[in-house]
Curated annotation (Swiss-Prot):
This is Adenine phosphoribosyltransferase. Keywords: Cytoplasm, Glycosyltransferase, Purine salvage, Transferase. Catalyzes a salvage reaction resulting in the formation of AMP, that is energically less costly than de novo synthesis. Pfam families: Pribosyltran (PF00156). One of its GO terms (biological process) is adenine salvage. The gene is apt. Pathway: Purine metabolism; AMP biosynthesis via salvage pathway; AMP from adenine: step 1/1. Its main location: cytoplasm. Its EC number is 2.4.2.7. It comes from Syntrophotalea carbinolica (strain DSM 2380 / NBRC 103641 / GraBd1). It is found in: Cytoplasm.
Length: 171
C-alpha cells in the first residue's frame, strides 16, 4: 500500500492555514495507481451480492463509478441540493462551522438492495453519517462504506452509525 500512499500529494495550508490537504488527484492521474486502487477495493466485494454503489459528491463519484463498473452494478449519486432532477429526500447535517445538506432520489433503491457507499476520504464522518441515513431511509442495506483514505486522527469512524467501514489507506 505504500506505493499508493506515496502517490498522494500533501498540500500544506489548504484550504486554510494549519490544514494539510491530502490531494488524491495525483493518484487519479496515474493510471497504474488508479487501477490498483480500484482493484484492491473492488476485490473486497467480489462474490458478495451488491446491488448498487452509492457515490458521494463529488470525488466519491470517481471511486463509485469505477467500483460499479468493476463489480457490474449501477451507481446511485448523493448530491448537494438542487442537482438531482427527480423527487428527492434530504438530510441536513452539522459541519465544524455550520450545516450542509445532501439529497438522493427517493426511488434510488428497491427494498432490501445491498449497497456499498464510496467516497474518497473519511475525515470527521459527518458527510457519510448523513449518507447512511439517506440510504437507510430509502430502504437499502449498507454492506460497507469504502474509502480510498482515512484521516484517523479525526476519529470519523466513531461518528458513523455502522461498524462496516473500510479504508484502503490510513493517515
Amino acid at each position: 500500500m505504500e506505493d499508493l500512499r506515496n502517490v498522494i500529494r500533501d498540500i500544506p495550508d489548504f484550504p486554510k492555514k494549519g490544514i494539510v490537504f491530502k490531494d488524491i488527484t495525483t493518484l487519479l492521474a496515474d493510471a497504474k495507481s488508479f487501477h490498483r486502487m480500484v482493484d484492491l477495493i473492488a476485490h473486497r466485494y467480489i462474490g458478495q451480492k451488491i446491488d448498487q454503489i452509492v457515490g458521494v459528491e463529488a470525488r466519491g463519484f470517481i471511486l463509485g463509478a469505477a467500483l460499479a463498473y468493476k463489480l457490474g452494478t449501477g451507481i446511485t449519486l448523493v448530491r448537494k441540493p438542487g442537482k438531482l432532477p427527480y423527487k428527492t429526500i434530504q438530510k441536513t447535517y452539522q459541519l465544524e462551522y455550520g450545516t450542509d445538506t445532501l439529497e438522493i432520489h427517493s426511488d434510488a433503491f428497491k427494498p432490501g438492495d445491498r449497497v456499498v457507499v464510496a467516497d474518497d476520504l473519511l475525515a470527521t464522518g459527518g458527510t457519510v453519517a448523513a449518507v447512511a441515513e439517506l440510504v437507510k431511509e430509502c430502504g437499502a442495506e449498507i454492506v460497507e462504506c469504502a474509502f480510498l483514505a482515512e484521516l484517523e486522527f479525526l476519529k470519523g469512524r466513531e461518528r458513523l452509525p455502522l461498524d462496516r467501514v473500510f479504508s484502503l489507506l490510513k493517515f
